[in-house]
């Protein structure tokens, strides 16, 4: 029985199938953890959703920014981005069922030995705070009021966590930290603009969220996706798994038990 954690799939379904064959994934005994962004610019977002959903309890999914955007598009709140290939989802007979299933997924998934989220965990949070914050937004997403949240989540402010944040300010920060964060300023403020590799950043105050000196200690390693420019990052405390399959890079997965990394080059689409 093994736990496999995969980075951003973004509709790269064929690569996912090859990757699972490579590691001999068995849905009857193994668990696949998906670090968000199941859908978007790859050619088979619909097939990806159907497959992951079909795994039932053998799949543990967290929501990414592209997944939330898909929900916004389904509600008419946002337009499909030009490069997104998600239209088949809306045209399919099971599209609404898949979207409902997606909306039930968490922002943070936890194993006794690790946690998985899409972008990361705010450097101002300990794990207990991260759990509580994730649950606040998850309960809204699963409620009848989810449209209100999706309609109002698009904002880069506030960029600094305070325990007394409330209402939309609180929800926006939580969503941005879990699904959009890459860099932070030295004082802990989130930067929502820079997507470069850390080595190319000229702004001296910017640093990856996981390298902030004052980052709260977590008692489990964090596995995340979202940041393709890292080209994979492995340390004792964090493991970044997005290696840009949708950008002609590769799809990367790690087996937790022995830390073996599996990689599948992007196919020509």
Curated annotation (Swiss-Prot):
This protein's UniProt keywords: Hydrolase
Catalytic reaction annotation: P(1),P(4)-bis(5'-adenosyl) tetraphosphate + H2O = 2 ADP + 2 H(+)
Keyword Hydrolase: yes
Record EC number: 3.6.1.41
NCBIfam families in alphabetical order: apaH, PRK00166.1
Molecular function per GO: bis(5'-nucleosyl)-tetraphosphatase (symmetrical) activity
Family membership: Belongs to the Ap4A hydrolase family.
Protein name in the entry: Bis(5'-nucleosyl)-tetraphosphatase, symmetrical
Transmembrane regions listed in the UniProt entry: none
Root EC class: hydrolase
Organism: Vibrio vulnificus (strain YJ016)
Gene name of this polypeptide: apaH
Gene3D superfamilies: 3.60.21.10
